[in-house]
């Protein structure tokens, strides 16, 4: 019987009988703990807002394992050629780290590869523009805006107008504008009409105002009569 709170531990013989494997060595446990701590520490740094307490605990664990391995001479004795011979448990962290780095590289490819097709397209642009031959920019605008038939008719009409203006003399030009009523363009008549209208309206307004108001002499006489009457009343009292 075992005391309360104690755990039963199997011996080496009992482990073999029960089918359990041998307990891994301390160095392997320490190495696996170091690998997991490094992976967790890197994942903490990848977060936007890492947990400070968690990252400090993981960093202290890594530092403690490093000190133990340096005291045992394993830290300085690790050679790069022994990496291929390492067990699978030790390579788990390196595989995870390499996988994350490869995924980041696939998501964000190198800028040189992205710029290459752009440079090729830019180099092809002048070739395409120069292949049909040099064209007048005015002709390209005509082709884009309207069909060829409309363009020809419009140019013919413009040519006819310019020819008529060049061939006719000043008298013919005056005949063109003879139908226009010149009274609309006579500035003197317009201004005189405006001034006469304003004068008549102002005079009418002043005459009406003068007729409505009584003469000043009559108002003064009435005021004096009222004052005399008031003075007489005061004297009698």
From Swiss-Prot:
Pfam families linked: SERTA
Function: May participate in the regulation of cell proliferation through the E2F/RB pathway. May be involved in molecular regulation of hematopoietic stem cells and progenitor cell lineage commitment and differentiation.
Keywords: Nucleus
Tissue-specificity statement: Expressed preferentially in hematopoietic progenitors and mature blood cells. Expressed at low levels in the heart, lung, spleen, and thymus and at a higher level in muscle.
Gene Ontology cellular-component terms listed: cytosol; nucleoplasm; nucleus; plasma membrane
Listed PROSITE patterns: SERTA
Stated name of the protein: Cell division cycle-associated protein 4
Subcellular location(s) per record: Nucleus
Domain SERTA: 26-73
InterPro entries: E2F-SERTA_domain_protein, SERTA_dom
